[in-house]
Amino acid sequence: MNNRVHQGHLARKRFGQNFLNDQFVIDSIVSAINPQKGQAMVEIGPGLAALTEPVGERLDQLTVIELDRDLAARLQTHPFLGPKLTIYQQDAMTFNFGELAEKMGQPLRVFGNLPYNISTPLMFHLFSYTDAIADMHFMLQKEVVNRLVAGPNSKAYGRLSVMAQYYCNVIPVLEVPPSAFTPPPKVDSAVVRLVPHATMPHPVKDVRVLSRITTEAFNQRRKTIRNSLGNLFSAEVLTGMGIDPAMRAENISVAQYCQMANYLAENAPLQES
């Protein structure tokens, strides 16, 4: 039997499809999401409706974003979900979540079992809409969740950690084994909750500057920041901010990266493109 076939659908490798089928895990995720009637619930990648059905049962209306046209068509004719669903058959990577929140008149509650091949770039896409999002619950590769929640002085800490924690409070929810999926992925999975900060703990003047600094620092993470960020900051400037130029990218806190971004935004602002 082809273990890529589930409920008559052949999982497509190019879409990174792995279908959740463990009822205990499904119940645990739905409990963590705790959907309520009247909320603007949005699912990314509903697939074969493992989460869509139990979430949809609790709601009068549910919005889903599904790239796979066959799966979108199945959802349209779903016996009890069909009338409740608003289906966008398009790529979540290009979806305008801000427009949807405006249309629905409230911040979105976004959830999904995300395709692992696009999970990191999709996170960055969603971060640009945190003003329009109340919270997010995602199943991700465990390694990605570890990176999202990592603190300084750890191998997992990187650009994704800094940017995620700049925008959101990041909370791990549960770990999920490969056996919970068809076909089983080659990696462990985990569920994470991301709640955009109501008030930014470390506001920056220009988030593009923060993005640039973290990209340059972590692209050369084995170098000291005296070297990796030498084109942006002198050792004297870093020392003046209380940041040791001999530290590496992984030793610098989110607050310190934001401090550096604000210094650069004031003293060498990016030109509008």
Swiss-Prot record:
One of its GO terms (cellular component) is cytosol. S-adenosyl-L-methionine binds at N18, L20, G45, E66, D91, N113. Its EC number is 2.1.1.182. Keywords: Cytoplasm, Methyltransferase, RNA-binding, rRNA processing, S-adenosyl-L-methionine, Transferase. It holds the Pfam family RrnaAD. Its main location: cytoplasm. Belongs to the class I-like SAM-binding methyltransferase superfamily. rRNA adenine N(6)-methyltransferase family. RsmA subfamily. Specifically dimethylates two adjacent adenosines (A1518 and A1519) in the loop of a conserved hairpin near the 3'-end of 16S rRNA in the 30S particle. May play a critical role in biogenesis of 30S subunits. This is Ribosomal RNA small subunit methyltransferase A. It comes from Escherichia coli (strain 55989 / EAEC). The lineage of its organism: Bacteria, Pseudomonadati, Pseudomonadota, Gammaproteobacteria, Enterobacterales.
